[in-house]
A protein has these predicted regions:
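Membrane-anchoring alpha-helices and their flanking helix-loop junctions
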Residues: 1-159, 166-208
Length: 208
């Protein structure tokens, strides 16, 4: 879990900062000719097949700017990191599940009820935040190209500032309650702190 969390906050934070400032990711792909059938035919063929699978047979990568094509590739990288991050955290938490202990059935039931409520609330926060910002902002599309759209920041954005980074990680504490493990709780605190550091070090400066 630590590896995937650091990959997300440190790795993505670093390359997104460079992309935001110098178009580093796009330039990296262009230098290697991955989108050019003459310069890198095998890689181009694989990417072409990937686009057809992901976006449909009608998608023509030659009709779209490189910035958009590279962003689509980047989104898939983000999905891999996020999926492994969530899976690793879930397995880590499950490996530390505690029983009743010395606290009795009542506290056990209360702990599980609150934990499940926090997980459900976390799911709502993520889903509603995605409804508001769509894929473009969810995957940092503004680091790659500008898209003029009028966003209405309602729903979860009226509950808390930067909800995806603040209350959007309350599920960490829900699982901490479900497991009854201090180890899970302190690891969750550290992971949430890294996410807030990502917000301060990359997100806020980029938006400004």
């Amino acid at each position: 879990f630590a590896i995937w969390r650091i990959t997300y906050n440190g790795g993505l934070g670093y390359i997104l900062t460079k992309q935001s400032q110098t178009r580093w990711i796009v330039r990296f792909v262009e230098r290697r000719g991955w989108l050019d059938a003459k310069k890198a035919p095998r890689m181009h063929a694989w990417i072409h097949s990937f686009y057809k699978t992901k976006l449909g047979a009608a998608y023509d990568m030659t009709c779209m700017p490189n910035e958009f094509n590279v962003w689509i590739l980047f989104r898939s990288l983000v999905d891999v990191i996020l999926l492994n991050d969530v899976t690793a955290y879930a397995l880590f938490s499950l490996s530390h599940v505690q029983g009743l202990g010395n606290y009795g059935m009542l506290l056990f039931v209360v702990r599980w009820c609150i934990g499940l409520l926090l997980l459900a609330f976390n799911a709502w926060v993520k889903l509603d935040a995605h409804r508001v910002v769509k894929d473009y902002a969810w995957y940092w599309g503004d680091c790659f190209f500008l898209c003029l759209q009028n966003l209405k920041f309602d729903g979860v954005y009226e509950v808390a500032p930067d909800p995806m980074y603040s209350i959007g990680y309350i599920g960490y504490y829900g699982l901490s309650l479900l497991t009854g493990s201090y180890m899970v709780f302190f690891v969750s605190l550290a992971a949430h702190a890294l996410q807030l550091l990502f917000l301060v070090a990359f997100e806020n400066p980029h938006m400004e």
